[in-house]
């Protein structure tokens, strides 16, 4: 009963965008810290069902913290992926799988589990994975949520049932047969809708979307804008398996500070004018060159409609 803080917890392993089913299987990799490990995917499942033998799942550790008053908190290993220590793999893995957020700054799915627990002021509903699979395949759909009594899942308008979390649960799950179309989750409290989320089957890659985290930066030669790059189909749906090589051009008071995509096995340069997308996304970082004025960023890829975004510099 002595009060303490968990100073290094979890050590769960995840690759953003990669899912290994059934989701209630557990993968403890490697067998020992000093024993080489190999899996052809060089990936770890984002269902929170993969961790090191000296650690635990994110949900398992959170359960210990919530259910034991003598634990005042935890330091999760880790918030972000980082270069080096590519547990459980060796070459060509060159960065870690431990993060809640990947190396490019994109949240992995478990980010929303923490948000649902730590942000009671925010209605959270996060349904995953994507909805591009093989016809008839059994797919496990998870939802992290808060501020609600239940979540109902619909596949192409047909209810797949209502789920509620038990005392020690942090997500709800449905196992359904895949059919192209739309999956929708609706969370409710006392019968009233709290939040909704839809995921649609994506078609072929058709266009690029650029989303800067800030549309205005300072003219100090240091300030940055982090621009998310996404590959979309003609209807604006994220293509979850896209690996298009995107090239960037900058005009005006700025330059490319770096690029990334979050892949732990990518050998691409961080300082370059192009990057392949990883599960449909990559990142380009724009830096001011010390001058005021505007900056225009253009993204192009073979066979796709180009995209542009403008950043103000003051």
Residue spans of the language-model regions?
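Short flexible loop/turn segments that cap and initiate beta-strands
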Residues: 146-160, 196-198, 224, 234-267
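Beta-strand-rich structural segments
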Residues: 141-145, 186, 211, 215, ...
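Extracellular Ig-like/FN3 beta-sandwich strand-entry sites
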Residues: 178-182, 224, 292-294
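Edge beta-strands of extracellular beta-sandwich domains
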Residues: 192-203, 305-313
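Beta-strand-rich extracellular modules
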Residues: 188-190, 300-304
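Extended substrate-binding grooves/exosites of carbohydrate-active enzymes
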Residues: 1-166, 171-178, 182-192
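Low-complexity, acidic Ser/Thr/Pro/Gly-rich terminal tails and inter-domain linkers that flank the onset
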Residues: 202-218
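Short, hydrophobic beta-strand segments
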Residues: 172-178, 271-290
């Amino acid at each position: 009963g002595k009060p303490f803080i968990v100073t290094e917890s979890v050590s769960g392993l995840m690759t953003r965008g990669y899912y290994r089913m059934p989701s209630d299987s557990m993968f403890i990799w490697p067998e020992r810290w000093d024993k080489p490990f190999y899996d052809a995917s060089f990936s770890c499942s984002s269902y929170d069902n993969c961790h090191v033998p000296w650690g635990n799942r994110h949900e398992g550790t959170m359960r210990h913290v919530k259910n034991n008053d003598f634990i005042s908190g935890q330091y999760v290993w880790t918030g972000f992926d980082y270069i080096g220590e590519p547990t459980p793999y060796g070459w060509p893995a060159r960065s870690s799988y431990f993060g809640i957020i990947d190396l490019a700054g994109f949240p992995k799915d478990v980010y929303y589990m923490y948000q649902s627990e730590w942000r009671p002021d925010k209605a959270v509903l996060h349904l995953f994975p994507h909805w591009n699979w093989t016809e008839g395949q059994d797919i496990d759909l998870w939802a992290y949520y808060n501020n609600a009594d239940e979540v109902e899942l619909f596949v192409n308008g047909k209810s797949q049932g209502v789920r509620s979390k038990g005392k020690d649960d942090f997500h709800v799950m449905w196992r359904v047969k895949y059919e192209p179309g739309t999956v929708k989750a609706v969370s409710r409290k006392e019968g009233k809708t709290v939040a909704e989320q839809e995921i649609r089957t994506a078609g072929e890659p058709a266009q690029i979307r650029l989303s800067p985290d800030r549309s205005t930066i300072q003219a100090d030669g240091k300030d940055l804008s982090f621009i998310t790059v996404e590959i979309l189909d003609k209807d604006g749906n994220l293509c979850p398996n896209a690996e298009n090589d995107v090239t960037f051009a900058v005009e005006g008071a700025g330059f490319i500070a770096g690029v990334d995509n979050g892949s732990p096995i990518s050998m691409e340069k961080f300082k370059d004018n192009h990057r392949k997308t990883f599960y449909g996304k990559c990142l380009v970082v724009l830096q001011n060159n010390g001058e005021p004025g505007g900056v225009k960023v253009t993204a192009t890829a073979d066979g796709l409609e180009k995209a542009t975004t403008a950043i103000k510099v003051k």
